[in-house]
Amino acid sequence: LVGSEMCIRDSCYTYQGQQGKEQFDLEPEDEVFLCNWAKENYGTEFIFVTNFPSSKPPFYAMNDKEDPRTACKFDLLFRGLEITTGGQRIHDYNEQLEKMKAQGLDPEDFKSYLESHKYGLPPHGGLGIGLERLVMKLLGQANVRQASMFPRDMNRLLP
């Protein structure tokens, strides 16, 4: 399966006529809309959403060097649901320190994390995939509990 990619600025806010929105974020109905749009226009059930505002992702997400207003972050949507999120991480000590301060975080609270930056980190990234979410969508289930061997919720903490 081939996926398509869309900058978040051009995503559902453009296609649903909400171009003037200041805050770029995806609601569940936006994710469904984007996946339907990708399927209709590109014949794929996967779509990558990129270029999130740099103020939204976590403090460790690297800003895009060409457009510092955006972060090097992505979400992968499949059949109307985010199944993966990831991006490039900051590996420069001073850049990490600046971003923490810009987000109102106290660097003292992250002393051991920052130590690794002082000694040199290679460029790196990461991602997280919701395997149970993916299985739920592949099997056409309505709830993630139906795709989990030992589902957890407010009333069930043990198998």
What are the functions of these language-model segments?
Residues 48, 73-77, 82-84, 128, ...:
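Structured core elements
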Residues 55, 82, 153:
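Short loop/turn segments at secondary-structure transitions that flank enzyme active sites
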Residues 87-88, 93-159:
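Active-site pocket scaffolds in enzymes
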Residues 4, 9-79, 102-115, 119-121:
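Metal-assisted phosphate- and nucleotidyl-transfer catalytic regions
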